[in-house]
Amino acid sequence: MKALTWLWLTSLPADTAKAVKEKYKKEIGKGLDLSITKPRKPEWLRENLLNPFRDWDGREHITAANAKKAADVYKKTIAAIHSVVKQTQGGAADIERLKQELRSTVLNYTEAFNKMDRRTGFIETVEREEIYMVLADLLQTAKQQLESAGVNIDDEVLFRPFHELREF
């Protein structure tokens, strides 16, 4: 195994982590730098497969509680957006009400992260970008779904509450 000098794996299924450790532990004595961290149980993988904040779990400066809260905020935001989009399925929808509900969803999303950050100030540049990109993806998907139902909402209307309220 002359070509392999290091093997670092993180956040992988627990059974895979165990198998890799077992297979390569003999190579450590031959100079292999082996690091297997954050083995994940099937339950964790199921719950976090689609969670864009799953990388927060285990980051040095982010508590497990804040990682879980971020995942919960994401789930609540998706549910709220789906609720808004669903209102357009029956035909005529009150566009102003839809805009207000989306605005409220963005406000709740933003305030949830503000509240989390107020306690410990853990949100740094990378997390700021992740929070914004997750919201951007959710709103872009909502906008596309609304447009397919004949409802057009300006991007600025969707993002304004985030920019106005964000403290982190």
Residue ranges and their predicted role:
Residues K69, V73, E101-N108, I131-V134:
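Residue-level detector of well-ordered alpha-helical segments, enriched
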Residues D15-K18, E22, Q100, E129, ...:
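Generic alpha-helical secondary structure signal
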Residues G31-G90, L165:
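Short terminal alpha-helical segments
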Residues E22-Y24, N48:
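Short, surface-exposed amphipathic charged segments that create phosphate/polyanion-binding patches used
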Residues M1-K18, K26-K38:
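Concave beta-strand-loop units of leucine-rich repeat
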Residues K75-Q89, L107-R118, A136-K143:
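Alpha-helical repeat scaffolds in large eukaryotic proteins
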Residues I28, D33-P42, G121-F168:
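Amphipathic alpha-helical binding modules
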Residues K86-S104, A112-I131:
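Short, solvent-exposed, charged loop/turn and helix-capping segments
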